[in-house]
A protein has these predicted regions:
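N-terminal Rossmann-like FAD-binding beta1-loop-alpha1 element of flavoenzymes
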Residues: 1-28
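Short loop/edge segments at beta-strand edges and connector loops
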Residues: 7, 80-82, 212-214, 220, ...
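Conserved Rossmann-like nucleotide-cofactor binding loop
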Residues: 11, 34, 251
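Glycine-rich FAD pyrophosphate-binding loop
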Residues: 20-45
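Mid-domain catalytic core of redox enzymes
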Residues: 22, 217-332, 337-346, 350, ...
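Dinucleotide-binding Rossmann-like beta1-alpha1 core, especially the glycine-rich loop
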Residues: 46-131, 139, 143
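Conserved flavin/dinucleotide-binding core of flavoenzymes
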Residues: 314-448
Length: 448
């Protein structure tokens, strides 16, 4: 079969890998100038390694991507440091990533520590999750952890992550995040871009046709009598394919496919998501040298973060990965999740840099703006799905109502959170589904 894959991110490349190995002809249509999607990197002229546009790491439990890494001969490039995760408490940076650190956390007494540890252990080791999706994370966490722990830890994180939707997110999503986390975090020699490049070359080596700067514009059934298949327009040209897999956002599928209608269309249009805005700073000095913090969760008290820190997380990458790979720069990400219509998507880089850099002295009183050697800004309007109550009923099927057309997006990996591991998983899952359907799809093509 001739198969088109819309999007050459991790999901698209993973699907292509399996489909090509099964003997099919695969064309990947990518609107960007490089493969990898949100896992792509960029490189300053001083650096040995490229850096992710949006911060990335793996957990030791990420079996899908680790399995693929092994298959393509890249396992020796994957390593797992043990960085420090901290929180801001009463204007101090406090490590908060192990039972010992929970005990010494100044906001908890011994009863709080026992309760926090017991509930967290339950979420970490329990497996059934469907009952949890009947409850919002806001209500469940408050009830089970108690008001004090909830207000100190979970509520600020939910607000920071989901903004105006924080009281809608179901508890199964939070369970999934806690269930798979590991203290050691995985990274690749050469960054995630090295993994993307390796997977891209494997796909090309199997015969995959990857077309960059070639955004998809329209997908429609071939309307000729007994023709079957799909007409895919990309880069101003229309080609016929036996099947197509869309690995971008559900909203883009709706725009690309005017023939999509009925319950499926209503289902994908009802899905909510948050965008991501990340400013990366190359600093002359470390911002969080005293605590050697990699990941700092910043408490948010309101969805608009008014009067507080204007982003969700500070990620000092070079407290995780040696800065010698980055020309001795200290790499700092300022990251936030915001609604797709948020002003951050229209503000200039200079405006956002003034806003973000203007609060960094709160985390290190010695910080001065002239520490910033260079900055970069990356934005994505579709980055974090918002799973509401009973979300499993709202997930679109991988098969769309249009024969031969499939959707494989981050909105369908629920209850798991978005990330490269689940991009690999859903990419390979949709490929196996398409292979299962191949007989009927090939039959239609033969009849034509």
């Amino acid at each position: 079969m001739r198969i088109a894959i819309i999007g050459a991110g991790i999901a698209g490349l993973s699907a292509a890998y399996d489909l090509l190995r099964a003997g099919h002809t695969v064309t990947l249509l990518e609107g960007d100038n490089q493969t990898g999607g949100l896992a792509t990197g960029f490189r300053d002229e001083r650096w040995e390694w490229p850096l992710e546009k949006f911060y990335h790491h793996l957990f030791t439990s990420d079996r899908s991507i680790i399995g693929l890494v092994e298959e393509i001969g890249f396992r020796d490039k994957l390593f797992f440091p043990r960085p420090t995760t901290s929180v801001v408490y009463e204007d101090r940076i406090v490590p908060f990533d192990s039972p010992l650190r929970w005990i010494t956390f100044p906001g908890f007494n011994l009863i709080d520590v026992a309760r926090f540890g017991a509930v967290s252990a339950y979420l970490r080791f329990t497996k059934p999750w469907r009952e949890l999706e009947k409850h919002t994370a806001d209500s469940w966490l408050r009830r089970v952890y108690g008001d004090k722990i909830y207000e100190t830890t979970w509520r600020p994180l939910l607000i920071g992550k989901f903004g105006p939707y924080y009281q809608e997110v179901n508890m199964a999503w939070m369970w999934a995040r806690l269930h798979v986390r590991s203290p050691r975090l995985g990274y690749f020699e050469g960054g995630f871009q090295a993994f993307v490049d390796q997977l891209t070359e494997v796909v090309r080596g199997l015969g995959g046709d990857i077309r960059l700067n070639c955004p998809a514009e329209r997908i429609a059934p071939d309307g000729r009598p007994d023709a079957g298949g799909l007409l895919v327009t990309a880069g101003g040209q229309t080609e016929r394919f036996d099947a197509a897999v869309v690995t971008t956002s559900p909203a883009l599928l709706a725009r690309l496919t005017p023939d999509l209608a009925g319950d499926y269309l209503r289902q994908i249009l009802a899905l909510k998501s948050m965008g991501a805005v990340v400013m990366t700073l190359a600093l002359k000095h470390s911002l969080m040298a005293d605590s050697h913090t990699y990941w700092l969760n910043i408490p948010a008290t309101s969805a608009d973060k008014a009067g507080g820190v204007p982003f969700l997380a500070l990620v000092e990458h070079t407290n995780y990965i040696d800065r010698r790979h980055y020309g001795d720069d200290h790499i700092l990400y300022c990251g936030d999740y915001v609604t797709p219509d948020h002003p951050y998507f229209t503000m200039t880089q200079e405006e956002l840099e003034r806003l973000f850099v203007g609060v960094l002295h709160h985390f290190n009183p010695d910080f001065r703006p002239d520490w910033v050697r260079r900055s970069w800004l990356f934005r994505a309007r579709y980055a974090q799905p918002v799973p509401g109550l009973n979300h499993s009923r709202a997930i679109p099927d991988l098969r769309t109502p249009i024969p031969g057309l499939y959707l494989a997006s981050m909105s369908q990996v629920y209850p798991w959170d978005r990330g490269t591991n689940y991009a690999v998983e859903i990419g390979r899952k949709v490929a196996q589904l398409l292979l299962t359907d191949a007989t009927s799809l090939s039959g239609r093509a033969s009849a034509a």
